[in-house]
Amino acid sequence: MFNFANFYQLIAQDTRLQPWLNVLPQQLTDWQNAEHGDFPRWLKALNKIPEGAPDQIDIKHSVTISNDTPFHQGELKKLESLLRTFHPWRKGPYTVHGIHIDTEWRSDWKWDRVLPHISPLKNRSVLDVGCGNGYHMWRMLGEGARLCVGIDPSHLFLIQFEAIRKLMGGDQRAHLLPLGIEQLPKLEAFDTVFSMGVLYHRRSPLDHLIQLKDQLVSGGELILETLVIEGDETAVLVPKERYAQMRNVYFFPSARALKVWLELVGFEDVRIVDENVTSVDEQRTTNWMTHNSLPDYLDQNDPSKTVEGYPAPRRAILVAKKP
């Protein structure tokens, strides 16, 4: 069983986040009571991971944990075996006492594209919607964020996050909650909200943008990253059934159309700050994620298209302000 008591105590002392306590404990109790087949096995492995503050932590330039006195070879092999229990590792990379967790995604590349365009995170409270295993939350703390709260309903992502946190010495500035955005009340409590790689999974994208706005304080900043297509402000792709073998994907606007959508729901100062075609070096199969990946989802004869014939994945980053 997971104990979220530390997070409850934390938000009880924050006047903006206190109202969350009206619903959050029951939501997390309901989550605990819902069974997941692999969860007991993962939890058993998590409990075996050593806890203790490492001598060196770098979350500014990477996510790297090390000791001045290296682990013995036997200890390293045991730790690597435990971490591999949590396969597949999709978001990263991490370097843990010399063990390089080579994840499917080079999430550090995305962070390098995002960081130059956002307001400094120093002393800000941050919400990361669809945070995966929390890689970007560690990087946000590396930029001086006061508090990072991530939400993602995946059991495995929570376990991976807690494994890294345990190896970091139990840092309480970052917390991952196994929830979806639709379960959050209108908190208006965060200085910065990130939604990266989520919008195209939402049946109602405008509602998602409103939900994000509802979490921001007045004057707060939204960083939105999603799959887009090329085109003017009227261009939107609605894939039939699958896109790059993904199910449950719905709306792929152009970056210019997405800017209009953000303005439509009340955001100001909307900027398109980056547009980038995803390369097969950024998303690929590794020995920490051995399933199919982007190279398998592109047309072998024309990599500018997916196997379904749609334009290959193109991602945009937009930054906007809540009035």
Swiss-Prot record:
It catalyses: carboxy-S-adenosyl-L-methionine + 5-hydroxyuridine(34) in tRNA = 5-carboxymethoxyuridine(34) in tRNA + S-adenosyl-L-homocysteine + H(+). It comes from the Bacteria. The keyword Transferase applies. It is an enzyme of class 2 (transferase). Its EC number is 2.5.1.-. Belongs to the class I-like SAM-binding methyltransferase superfamily. CmoB family. Catalyzes carboxymethyl transfer from carboxy-S-adenosyl-L-methionine (Cx-SAM) to 5-hydroxyuridine (ho5U) to form 5-carboxymethoxyuridine (cmo5U) at position 34 in tRNAs. This is tRNA U34 carboxymethyltransferase. It comes from Vibrio vulnificus (strain CMCP6). The lineage of its organism: Bacteria, Pseudomonadati, Pseudomonadota, Gammaproteobacteria, Vibrionales.
